[in-house]
Amino acid sequence: MTGRDGPDNGTAFTGVRIICGIVGLLARGEGDPVAAVRRQCDSIVHRGPDDEGLYGEPGFAFGMRRLSILDIAGGHQPFRSPDDRFVLMFNGEIYNFAALRAELAAAGRVFRSSGDAEVILAGYERWGAEVFGRLDGMFAVAIWDRQARRLVLARDPVGIKPLYYSDQPAGFAFASELQALTLLPGFHWTTDPRAQLDYFRFGHVRTPRTIHAEARTLPPGHILTVTRGAEPELTAYWTPRYTPAPPLPPEEWVERFRRTWLDTVAEQMVADVEVGAFLSGGIDSSAVVAAMTRVSDRPVRSFTIGFPDPRYDESRHAEAVAAALGTVHTTRTLDLVGAQDLLPTVAASYAEPFADPSMVPTWYVSRVAAEQVKVALSGDGGDELFFGYKRHATERRVGALPAPLRHAARAIGAVPTLPWRRANETVQRWTRTAASAGLPCGVSRFFAKLQITSPGLRAQVFAPEFLAMDGDPRGEIARLRAEYFPNSTALSADTLEQFALCDLALNLPGAMLTKVDRASMAHSLEVRVPMLGQKMVELALAMPAAMKLDGTTGKKVVRQAIAPWLPAGLFDRRKQGFQMPLSAWFAGDFGRYAEMLWRESGARDEGIWRRSAVDGLFADHRAGKRDHSRFLYALAVYCLWKARVRPAS
């Protein structure tokens, strides 16, 4: 949460930089909910150990936790409007607050502080809910209208800041983390079977669902209005759409990217403490650090994680980039024993099953960074907006095939994978591509490619009655497409642009940004993502696909923009990211640890499984017959949630 809200005495200053979590409860009765909200605040103290703010009145209370990056008097929330009608708490950063403040001041508003909290509230008083579409930043906002007894919640357009809510007979509650909801007295929780299936399909629960049937995430770019005696009203204030710009020469696109990128990074580096960066040595993180060194007047601190296995170790690439850019660089190595020891703690940070393989190294690099800085920049979002994944290149190839060949490829994709582990990693990727080739559009192929398990594997390990509750498996892709994109005419004709819209709707808020938020907040570290700044998103949604994908090479414009800043060849290599060597680890001690979790956590006793089939996957993987590491990793994390995180129903 930002609260550059010090006394406004006419002195210009960058202001207080704070981050936090917010929580609240609108009770059905007229009791005092402050004690319950204080307990919620205590459960997210890691998001802000320095300060607590609470507001309460009969039937309603909300609170926040704050980490002060510079503690200036007046940064404390809640923030009240001059007439005392509105009370605000929010979590985030508003980068264009100065411009909005000037506009409001020109209209006659007199400000009492120097910060963005008051600007949001003043904007809401003047423009109503329209203010949220004017904010450039990352935020989760809660505004209580004392006169109308109305609560308004809003979340930033791409979902950088989280916000969960639950509407139950005991009341309406919200929180920055799911675990804070589960502590409320009188609230009851059951596991959503569709969320369970989602998890084993995608490796995370699809937004807006959570693992609990009674809780939801507020979708990015949405407002939720809650009034007593009425159903909560959900409205979208921003929807991603491609708005192609007039044709420009390639070199002008590169210059536009470079200029926008430098401005965005400079904007997100404003702080009264040192700002660091995650550096994997790949294109996006290198672009972040290269820009930071150009807009900062002091050395940049960079951080990376290495692995003993050279096939997965990027630390030497990161160190080469750091040396070229002159950063103060820190590398730590994460081995099998360390990862296994960390996994229970990391899994608990999410309060629901979450199985991105890079969650452990991301958690670890956040811990390393938090030892030296309070703010770090990350390159997340670059692959999604500028076509950096393998799926973008393969989609171009598949999309160029005549329809009969695509349907033939889909039939080939049904052939079982080869029984050799080293070949199997590549074969499985191409099998997913082939299996999706005959699907009718880019959105459908995106959902097929994003899955971490095949329909065949799910039929093998899950009980038929569990799978049946989701309907005919042959129609699952069509159902997903209809859920996220009911208006197909709003989609771009370019399938890669459809991929980007899918990432903005599903993968970024549900997986990538969730991973980074929980990993960093566990260590009271603020992570900012300049690739997902408003101007960068607008640029990406206006840029032609040809500037992003050059044949089979993604992020063309990013490569060309940063080429003058780094020695040639530093980032022309195979993409890795902070990934763990799962296949090899599950063949040894890590696999035995996961199998122990499966047998002892209670998950095996659920009626959703074909238990002997799951037992067989462990044996097949150990024997090198099949690579089941993605499913087994998801299962291990699920077992940890089952045993340790899940609240009592």
Language-model region placement:
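Ala/Thr-enriched low-complexity intrinsically disordered regions
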Residues: T2, T11-T14
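Membrane-proximal basic amphipathic "stem/tether" segments
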Residues: R397-L450, A636
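Cysteine-centered catalytic environments shared across enzyme families
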Residues: V16-Y350, T362, S366, P564, ...
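Glycine-rich loop motifs involved in handling phospho/adenylate chemistry
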Residues: V275-D284, D309-P310, P357-V360, L385, ...
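Adenosyl-5′-phosphate
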Residues: G15-I19, L183, D192, A213-P220, ...
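Short low-complexity, flexible loop/linker segments enriched in glycine and/or proline
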Residues: P344-A348, A370, H392-T394, W585-A587
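Active-site adenylate/phosphate-handling loop in enzymes that bind or generate adenylated species
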Residues: P157, Y364-A423, N507, M512, ...
